[in-house]
């Protein structure tokens, strides 16, 4: 998962095992959405193999709590939404689709109880309060 730390906006997400191919997909998906050249990651060696030389790569636990909290919210909501859909499909692609819906919900509809704002508002992508109807009629899924 690729997150803008200042706003909490989820920029990109890839579902799968930790492989170089997965990291390449995450990097490619993130690069098209932001000009950020600073990556803070864990100590997994795949990042060093995949990230280009122009990217400032820092290894550390800084901001880990925020990333893990967002990851936990997305995992919990994906599990809830997926259980409601199990009678229709038990495929990996279904989990991926539901995860994209959950991330869209998190970015545009879910309001942070402490800050009182949504990630898209903090990133200045909108000044409007979004609801399910807005999300369904406007393409927000990445």
List each model region and its residues.
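Residue-level recognition of single "structural anchor" positions
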Residues: 1-142
């Amino acid at each position: 998962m690729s997150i803008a730390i200042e706003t909490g906006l989820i920029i990109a997400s890839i579902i799968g095992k930790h492989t170089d191919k997965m990291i390449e997909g995450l990097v490619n998906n993130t690069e098209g959405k932001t000009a950020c050249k600073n990556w803070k990651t864990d100590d997994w060696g795949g990042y060093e193999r995949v990230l280009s030389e122009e990217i400032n790569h820092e290894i550390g636990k800084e901001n880990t709590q925020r990333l893990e909290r967002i990851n936990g919210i997305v995992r919990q909501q994906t599990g809830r939404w997926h259980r409601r859909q199990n009678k229709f499909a038990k495929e990996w692609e279904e989990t991926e689709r539901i995860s994209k819906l959950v991330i869209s919900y998190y970015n545009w509809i879910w309001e942070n109880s402490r800050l009182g704002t949504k990630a898209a508002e903090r990133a200045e992508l909108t000044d409007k309060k979004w609801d399910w109807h807005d999300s369904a009629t406007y393409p927000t899924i990445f």
